[in-house]
Amino acid sequence: MKFNLGSLNKQKKLREMLIYCFLETTAWWLIISRFTGANPLSSLTTRTVSLMTFSLISAFLIAFIMDTNFSSNLILPIGIIGLIPIILDIEKLTFPIFGLLLLLIIGLFASCIPQLQLQNYFGLLTISLLVVAVVPITIYYGQYHYFPNALFTSFIAFWFLTAFFLEPYFTKKTQSISITSIVLLGATVVAIFFLSHIFLAFVSVILLLVSWYAKPLLLKSHWWLIIFGILQIIISFAL
């Protein structure tokens, strides 16, 4: 019996992208739910549906860009599709929110243009910040029409965590022992312990350390982004 390794690898990539898409979207909305103590999905308005649709497509786009090594011709079409529900509901979302969401898509697309040279440490930190902040900010602003500065503090742990997990895609360093990986790991661990729920902080750190140790295997087996999504949800509950 012959196994088509190429087909098997594509299936693993698709599995990783779809699961991460669900986990990332859940984490984005959970951050706001935990911060406010309210369910942002309690009232299903057209604005909520538009933001949820954008969240799902954006999360898929992030995983798609990473798993295709920033080089697929489908990146721009997927980004445009993600903006369609926002454009159709732009009157209810307001122009500033549309501009912020557009910034995420532009940032992701720009990271794929070799001439811009964003596949480096600057690009890593910039894209990680956009991935962490844009959707939660728009969800909160869309619900309450203002944005509290205190929410930025909760983004710090997620920013370092995102940079840690996206680092191998931007730097092409898949080994666990590298200066960048260790620095981001240390920064993430410190930021996590500033969260309010100590037990979940410990659980997050243990899973993070195991992920760091098994980094080459998780990347090769396409579990890396899935672990990333799971960790975000755990840390969301620690807020």
Task: Please describe what each predicted stretch is.
Residues 1-101:
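N-terminal topogenic module of multi-pass integral membrane proteins
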Residues 127-177:
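Functional transmembrane core segments of multi-pass inner-membrane proteins
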Residues 76-141:
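Intramembrane alpha-helical segments
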Residues 42-43, 72-74, 93-101, 119-123, ...:
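Short, aromatic-rich membrane-interface segments at the entry and exit
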Residues 5-19, 63-76, 110-129, 170-183, ...:
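Interhelical loop and helix-boundary elements at the membrane-water interface
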Residues 26-29, 168, 182-239:
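C-terminal transmembrane-bundle signature of multipass membrane proteins
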Residues 26-48, 83-99, 133-153, 189-200, ...:
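Helix-coil boundary and interhelical linker segments in multi-pass alpha-helical membrane proteins
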Residues 50-61, 102-114, 131-133, 154-166, ...:
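Alpha-helical transmembrane segments and their membrane-interface exit regions
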